[in-house]
């Protein structure tokens, strides 16, 4: 019998990629004020923001679209789009005022380089631009932060001031030999470096400023800034402790001050992106006296504080610090008037049956409170799905809003006055936009969802979730009885399964997970004729805290065994072509892929990795997350730790490079030269080792790309190269 014919011609694969990459992704949504028509009908405007790959311009474009939702207070009566999509160029942040009558927009304009770009803060009212402030020209601070870690754009409750976060203004610096600045009448006072406010400091032009690591290289020392909209005056708030970097700020009740999260940056900064374990606390700074008050435990990590509609309580997420980067979190509640903090939802060690398995989201949506300030709505991975939940902050009860559905994954974009705006997708259905009202307490599972934007499903992709129980010899001694899952995609129109090749994808992290949502690469591969196995090995998020804690100290062993076990089980049950199995993974997924071709060289016929961890020991001194190297190798981390020989040996023992002599699988390496998380020298180290052993290996080095290789030009090129590599070495 002939083998399964793969879509292997470059032109065909490129055409398929071009078509699928046009699927847009939802990035944000907000709800306008309620409007009552002259006939008594009520409606609200839904403003949505989307991103889409543009292969002609080789960039991600952003666009917006508005919808009208007519309702009766409890349910949606009618909903539909209000006009076509419009591209939003230059918008970095935007936020509606509390009343919905104004909108603030942070916009970049000017040249292509960061030095030439200018930032403007605009205030819009109805059909006109009311105010525009050239923040770059005012020189009160550096660039404004637009990221979701530190960044914010918050209206005061009075709608007279705007709060945002920007980089602290740096003093000017110049050479010791800058002749135009030379003053022949210089005195001893000048030599003592007593400077005028804007006078340049000699010899500081190469002074090192720490940043916050991967994807945050332009962020160093954030400050809280307040713009008086009427006068145009900008104030940089004082009172923030010198030892912390502020972010995620909002106005306190009554506009008396500002609440913010402060991250410790002493003795040095660690990478903060995708790391919910960075020591931080909740603070309040009073605007009248500049006094700063600590509102939470300062020995843990906190994120995404959200003020209730009645301005009485603040809910936020809390995680242990300096342990695994992502883990099960606590939902905490701070009462503004009693000053009491309570834990609403605690860490869940292990899921029991169909019960809630814990909170694993890294951020709460900006809008997450119910109208009565009693319930909080959020999304979180639960095993291999992502569901919506409502938690009663008084009772601590957690109820699923999406249980018993079609098995796809949900994401909450916002909720306001109990009207929820959500995204839904599956591995075979791209994201769709839905709205629905939060039912009364006790009836949460009765949500009636109405679609605003539907995506066409792909009937030629079928998928399922496989539950896997490790064999007894692979059980964890301390955390026995843990299972794990894998999501299997396969062509639904395949004539003969025994001829279908399979691509195995372990996720990165390692403490993250695949969920049953739309993913471009797996969908592409499946439409090309591959089965795709996405493995959530033990240590993945969504399966309870015990599962996460089982992996540190066992990387390179437990996770590798889990992936291999999943592969063998699926091959046995589905009867795919065992002679054509390939691996594809990035970061820790690349780490596992390189382990697997070394530990099980007979199983895999091809391998593609992106920015893989190859040698934990050599990575520790160059990564922005040295704590990852220590913790995942099974050791505790502190900022002053100096590993001894036994620690270095353990790191090396758990690294893929240990098994390099056994590797014979053809390998495609794809590296980002600007990667701060897993520096590209890791992949180079492996490349040279394999080249010296005559293993077929190809290296693609993307000069300006970072860890995710997510730039449109890089992503598209890397996918095409990966596809051709698989087709070459698996046979078409």
UniProtKB/Swiss-Prot annotation:
GO terms for molecular function: omega peptidase activity; serine-type endopeptidase activity. It catalyses: Cleavage of an N-acetyl or N-formyl amino acid from the N-terminus of a polypeptide. Its EC number is 3.4.19.1. The modification N-acetylmethionine is found at residue 1. It is an enzyme of class 3 (hydrolase). It comes from the Eukaryota. It is found in: Cytoplasm. Keywords: Acetylation, Cytoplasm, Hydrolase, Phosphoprotein. Expressed in the liver (at protein level). Pfam families: APEH_N, Peptidase_S9. The active site is at 587 (charge relay system), 675 (charge relay system), 707 (charge relay system). Homotetramerization is required for activity. Tetramerization results in the formation of a gated channel which is involved in substrate selection and substrate access to the catalytic sites. InterPro entries: 6-blade_b-propeller_TolB-like, AARE_N, AB_hydrolase_fold, Pept_S9_AS, Peptidase_S9_cat. The modification Phosphoserine is found at residue 187. PANTHER family: ACYLAMINO-ACID-RELEASING ENZYME, SERINE PEPTIDASE S9 FAMILY MEMBER. This enzyme catalyzes the hydrolysis of the N-terminal peptide bond of an N-acetylated peptide to generate an N-acetylated amino acid and a peptide with a free N-terminus. It preferentially cleaves off Ac-Ala, Ac-Met and Ac-Ser. Also, involved in the degradation of oxidized and glycated proteins. This is Acylamino-acid-releasing enzyme. It comes from Sus scrofa.
């Amino acid at each position: 019998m002939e083998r399964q014919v793969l879509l292997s011609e470059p032109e065909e694969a490129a055409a398929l990629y071009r078509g699928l990459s046009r699927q847009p992704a939802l990035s944000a949504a907000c709800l306008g004020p309620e409007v009552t028509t002259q006939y008594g009908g009520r409606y609200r405007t839904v403003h949505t923001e989307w991103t889409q790959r543009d292969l002609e311009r080789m960039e991600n474009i952003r666009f917006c679209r508005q919808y009208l939702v007519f309702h009766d207070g409890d349910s949606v009566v009618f909903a539909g789009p209000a006009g076509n999509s419009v591209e939003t160029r230059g918008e970095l942040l935007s936020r509606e005022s509390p009343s919905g009558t104004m909108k603030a927009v942070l916009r970049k304009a000017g040249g292509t380089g960061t030095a030439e770009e200018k930032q403007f803060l605009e205030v819009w009212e109805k059909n006109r631009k009311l105010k525009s402030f050239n923040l770059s020209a005012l020189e009160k601070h550096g660039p404004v932060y637009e990221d979701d870690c530190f960044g914010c754009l918050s209206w005061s409750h009075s709608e007279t001031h705007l709060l945002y976060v920007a980089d602290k203004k740096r003093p000017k610096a110049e050479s010791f030999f800058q002749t135009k600045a030379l003053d022949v009448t210089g005195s001893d006072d000048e030599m003592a470096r007593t400077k005028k406010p804007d006078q340049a400091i000699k010899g500081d032009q190469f002074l090192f400023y720490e940043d916050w690591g991967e994807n945050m290289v332009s962020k160093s020392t954030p400050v809280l800034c307040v713009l008086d909209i009427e006068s145009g005056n900008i104030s940089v708030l004082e009172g923030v402790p010198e030892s912390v970097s502020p972010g995620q700020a909002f106005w306190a009740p009554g506009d008396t001050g500002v609440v913010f999260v402060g991250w410790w940056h002493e003795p040095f900064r660690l990478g903060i992106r995708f790391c919910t374990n960075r020591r931080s606390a909740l603070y309040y700074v009073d605007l009248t006296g500049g006094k700063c008050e600590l509102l939470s435990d300062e020995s843990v990590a906190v994120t995404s504080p959200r003020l209730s509609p009645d301005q009485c309580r603040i809910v936020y997420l809390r995680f242990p610090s300096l342990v695994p980067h992502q883990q099960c979190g606590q939902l905490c509640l701070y009462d503004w008037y009693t000053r009491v903090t309570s834990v609403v939802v605690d860490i869940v060690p292990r899921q029991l049956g169909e019960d809630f398995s814990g909170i694993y989201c890294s951020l709460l949506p900006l809008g997450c409170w119910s109208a009565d300030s009693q319930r909080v709505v959020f999304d979180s991975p639960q095993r291999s799905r992502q569901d919506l939940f409502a938690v009663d902050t008084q009772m601590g009860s957690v109820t699923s809003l999406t249980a018993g559905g079609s098995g796809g994954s949900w994401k909450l974009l916002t909720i306001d006055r109990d009207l929820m705006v959500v995204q839904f997708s599956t591995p075979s259905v791209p994201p769709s936009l839905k709205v629905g009202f939060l039912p009364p307490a006790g009836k949460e599972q009765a949500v009636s969802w109405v679609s605003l934007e539907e995506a066409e499903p792909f009937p030629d992709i079928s998928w399922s979730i496989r539950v896997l129980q490790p064999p007894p010899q692979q059980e964890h001694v301390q955390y026995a009885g843990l299972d794990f899952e894998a999501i299997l995609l396969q062509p639904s129109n395949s004539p003969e399964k025994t001829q279908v090749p399979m691509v195995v994808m372990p996720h990165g992290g390692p403490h993250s997970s695949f969920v049953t949502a739309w993913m471009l690469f797996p969908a592409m591969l499946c439409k090309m004729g591959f089965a795709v196995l996405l493995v959530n090995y033990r240590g993945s998020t969504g399966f309870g805290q015990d599962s996460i804690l089982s992996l540190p100290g066992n990387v390179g062993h437990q996770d590798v065994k889990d992936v291999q076990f999943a592969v063998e089980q699926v091959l046995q049950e589905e009867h795919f072509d065992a002679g054509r199995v390939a691996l594809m993974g990035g970061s820790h997924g690349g780490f596992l892929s390189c382990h697997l071709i070394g530990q099980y060289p007979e199983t895999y016929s091809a391998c593609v990795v992106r920015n893989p961890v190859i040698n934990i020991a050599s990575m520790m001194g160059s990564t922005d997350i040295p704590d990852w190297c220590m913790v995942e190798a099974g050791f505790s981390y502190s900022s002053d730790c100096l590993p001894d020989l036994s620690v270095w040996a353990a790191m090396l023992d758990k690294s893929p490079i240990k098994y390099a002599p056994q590797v014979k699988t053809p390998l495609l390496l794809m590296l980002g030269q600007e990667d701060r998380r897993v520096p590209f020298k890791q992949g180079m180290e492996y490349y040279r080792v394999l080249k010296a052993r005559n293993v077929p290996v190809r290296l693609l080095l993307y000069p300006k790309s970072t860890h995710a290789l997510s730039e449109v030009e890089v992503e598209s090129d890397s996918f095409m190269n990966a596809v051709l590599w698989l087709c070459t070495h698996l046979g078409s």
